Amino acid sequence: MTKRKKKTTFERLSGMNRQQRKELQRRLYSGDPGLEVVHPDAAGIDIGNDSHFVAVAPSRDEQPVREFGSWTAELEKMAEWLKACGIRTVAMQSTGVYWFAVQDTLERHGLEVFLVNARHTRNLPGRKTDVQESQWLLKLHTYGLLRNSFRPPEEIRKLRNIWRLRDRHVGESARAVQHIQKALISMNVRLANAISDISGTSGMAIIRAMLRGERDPIKLAALRDRRVRATEKEVALSLEGVWQDDHLFELEQAVDMYDFQQKLLAGCDRKLESYLAALPAREIAAADKQAPPEEEPVVTGESTDSKKRKRKRNKGKRTSGNAPKSFDLRAELKRVCGVDLTRVDGLDVMVVQTVIAEVGPDLGSRFASEGHFTSWLRACPRPDISGGKVIRQTREPSSGRIMKGLRMAASSLLRSDSHLGARYRHLRMRLGAPKAIKAMARQLACIIYRLLTKGHAFVDAGAEQFELKRKERELARLKARANSMGLQVVPIPA
């Protein structure tokens, strides 16, 4: 069989008729890549701190690229100019926080805004200027080559902003506790060795008494709560230190910072409660409620044994110490979601609230399937296909807040006597801890998607069922391997 010779450019041109050559010449001179125009009324904006560059098609205005300032009045002029040019949709990169005001202004004027990832809009090397960047965004958006980023509704965005702000205050409180512990250790006051949480009731009572001038270890140890495991004598021994004025001042400053952060946390909790109360109660339509497959741990209906396991598990399930204490967050989340996501092993109110604050409870209208949802979370590898074959599977970094919470929830399943706990231990033994944690985080994301879209009631199938099915699969593999070698697996008589 002779190898087919590749035609040169001149040979391909000679094979064209007159009409084909004219069409090729028109495309070359006009810069038309031959793609289908998806958004004819499009514009591109290069977002900046001091100014924004806006590009429209040359046929829309004599000056197709204009620069507008970042003032509110300039943003209004930008929106009016785009409407005068007949623009309906605009593409811009999500650069820092500079795009917030631009998007709000354009949407208020009735323009559709495509917020795109900057990694998906890279231009050719050497063409990184503000004008060329806006024109490049215009060209990509005109031919429908950009993917709009997910942005939840306004009420969910408000909830997300408060929850993220609260998370920062929690981090600042933790740093204040570290400064408190540093000041105590500097005076050789080893309170943390006797009391695990110095920011708790006993720890703060003792520390505040120190700041009021009390130095007697016996009197300070008497302030401990009776639930503290360490004896009063052990606590008193840990409070014998070298009292120094500079370290006491450092301790006072750290306690003031901790109290200030706790005050800010209380304000965030009140705002969070009002935003959650404003969200409507969600009821999943009866048509969407479907019975899940039997092999999944999400099932409808409960047996007597599963009820006993659930009561035993919920009894020992602690609420996170950083959860709001001024209202019942679990009850509010159940009302907003329509299902109780905290019944899933590993998920507490903090993880569930993070999921709801980031994407909202209505996942079905935003993500077509659980595969789309986990892909958006970067919880699954991205296959690179060439020649009809998967040549590699790239794992993108998943540093989002939802995946952080799900990974923490997955790692807490190590000692869980449940179906998910047994599966995590099995994967941990096979793949190692990092891969097992990410795999279980993806499974938790799939369970959340099913619960929020189908209205399943979560009932733990139990670790025994997982082990039973695992042994059945292993036995089936052994039989298949024995048959391939002409052998037979014979059970040992009891």
Give the label of every model feature segment.
Residues M1-A494:
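A detector of single, family-specific signature residues
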